[in-house]
Amino acid sequence: MKKFLKYLLVLIILILIAGIVFLFRPIASKQVQTAKDEPVVDAVLVGGGIMSATLGTYFTELEPNWQIRMYERLDQVAQESSNGFNNAGTGHSGFMEMNYTEEKNGKMEIAKAEKVASQFEVAKQFWSYQVKQGVLAEPKTFINPVPHIAFVWGDNVKFLEKRYAAMIQSPLFKGMKFTEDPAVIKQWAPLVMTDRDPTQKVAATRMEVGSDVNYGSITKQLVNHLNQNPNFKLQTSTEVTGISQNDDKTWTVSFKNLKTGKTDHVKTRFVFIGAGGAAVKLLQLTGLPEAKQYAGFPVGGEFLITDNPAITAQHTAKVYGRAELGAPPMSVPHIDTRYIDGKKYVLFGPFATYSNKFLKNGSQLDLLASTNKSNVLPMTTVGLENLDLVKYLVSQVMMSDEDRLNELRKYYPDAKAEDWRLSQGGQRVQIIKKEPGKPATLQFGTEIFASKDGAVTALLGASPGASTSPYIMLNLLEKAFPQQTEGKWNQKLHEIVVSYKQDLSKDPVLLDKVRQYTSSTLGLNYTSPFKAANDETAAAPVAKAN
């Protein structure tokens, strides 16, 4: 027995030593020796998703002569989180997402919903501009009119009524309708009311101007157009393996062709890491001190999906419920109309899954590989402080098919198991951030990372993500290129996004013009709720330059 305990103690000590060695291993890329006369490109985009495609499109419009390179590890672009089946396709506008509004001290706070709604208006303007320029094809190939509905029952009816009363005070939510009449709700969303208990108290709000968006289609179309530019080069099946700074302050991005095994590198003045969940891991390769404050917590999602015409014909809406008390924001249940590659689906979820992968097509070693001496303590602290989240994830992972069907029946009482299949969605990585002098926090939104000189940028986090990609990338341009956005790029940015630098929540006239223009261009449903609509011809509103 003593001998066994001795060996056990030695084993524990060896494991501890190995763990310490692992945590203190160098994670930054080694500097690559490059030739002095080696060409330098203007921008490298890591990842072939909607963020890189959007930023690349901005670049080609603002600087047509820039040399741009895009590297994607899969054999096609838009196959991770941007893929139509890997996300809910919501054009997040704050109309129905009740987690964007909360009641504090008896007052309904709608600022976050206004922020998200304003950002999606930027997205619609960006896409409208691309349609006008012939970059994006027929709008129905990527966006379709789908009303957004918030639906509740029981004790949540009062919450929704208060939410509605607060939201219609903002120009962004003018035109929202509220009802407690089951017959009206059945007209709006028949599936939700079919065979529902007639004694159950229900309520709903509706915004007609809502949309369903295929971000995979947008990504592919933007990249196809970028490929027509001789200054742009896309390499698929290519994994970025290193990002290191050169003595002249440029950066070298090293990569490997996953089909041939060939390695190479490129020198660049600017790097954007738009690799979804893998962004945290890739950012660590830079060795930048400000990158050390980040870690990632991966969470997956599953959806129940049907393409049965008898069901899809009855549902043209995105219906969001309210997350149960104590549940995280990612848990908001919704039953959605989806249009993917010309076919109509109905999707319900999400059901959380857990995996150590940072990408759907990633490795189970991703979480471990991103752990180091700088973030192991914040990760542990956040884990202990968010036991409710851990408990929620465990409960979700333990769900049976019958459990999931019962959840669906809360929103579609007549649902039958044979009509639905379970589909694995994309992988999201929530940010764990430890700022100097502050406690570590788990964040549920998106965050733009920019180095002090703006030469290295990244997008971290998840929701609302793709739906506000044009706004997020515009914000990134401001952080990385402040002089250009205030100077020579300013006029062009106002052409692309007419409301650039304007607060639509405080300018109902401009908001109305913008919505009429984008709805006409994108084929969305919009009837002006403002009595003095200035221009019913849906002409593009005039931009105001700074």
From Swiss-Prot:
One of its GO terms (biological process) is tricarboxylic acid cycle. It catalyses: (S)-malate + a quinone = a quinol + oxaloacetate. Keywords: FAD, Flavoprotein, Oxidoreductase, Tricarboxylic acid cycle. It holds the Pfam family Mqo. NCBIfam families: mal_quin_oxido, PRK05257.1-1, PRK05257.1-4, PRK05257.2-1, PRK05257.3-2, PRK13339.1. HAMAP family: MQO. Pathway: Carbohydrate metabolism; tricarboxylic acid cycle; oxaloacetate from (S)-malate (quinone route): step 1/1. This is Probable malate:quinone oxidoreductase. Its cofactor is FAD. The keyword Cell membrane does not apply.
